[in-house]
Amino acid sequence: FTPEAFLQLISAFSSMFNARSIVDGLSLMNEESVGKQIAVKNLNISDEGLHPDNVGAFTFDGEGTPTQNINLIISGVLKNLLHSEATARKFGVQPTGHAGLGAKVSVSPDWLVVSNSENEKDKDESLSTTSTLKEYILIDELSAIHSGVKASQGSFSLPFDGWIVNDGKKTSIEAATVAGDILKVLTSIVKIDKEQIVTHQGISPHVWVENMSITGEA
């Protein structure tokens, strides 16, 4: 996955981190999920609304709670959830500054940042896993996010633009679809590049995932 495509996928399943979705029964997670391993050990994901590269940053959320940076996944472990005032009271924690006001108070991330955990043995192991690859598929951009994602079930089937890379030669892919389960994706990551790229929706490196289901033609 390119940084843009991986952020698209994580954002589509941000209900995993959303306490409002958990309360409403629309999340893959529950109250007991915090503290559990849900991804490979070298994956970090945080929400950093105050990051200097986030040009659309707000100091406060819709309820007036100060915006704050919060770790969501550290070394593959779910560490925190995103809260409004109401969900924070229900869970017995402090609001995190992620509420939006509308007909109903919503909760959503501001600026996702994906990185490789440091000092993990499997980081070096994963580098060797992909360094010898002669052919792979690069997913550049996902489409039909709203119709192709079943967030509460964890499944997705999404058209994508991308490339077949063979010995460094890139061939454009036409009319292809990638399908799978988000929790399986998070546990099937074999490499997270060191270099992070700033995009319009957050920051991420390239992320390599094995055993993806892809159909289509070049």
Please report, for each region that a protein language model flagged, where it lies by residue.
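Active-site pocket-lining segments that scaffold enzyme catalytic pockets across diverse folds
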Residues: 1-32
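Dual-mode signal for accessory low-complexity, basic/Gly-rich regions
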Residues: 17-19, 32-218
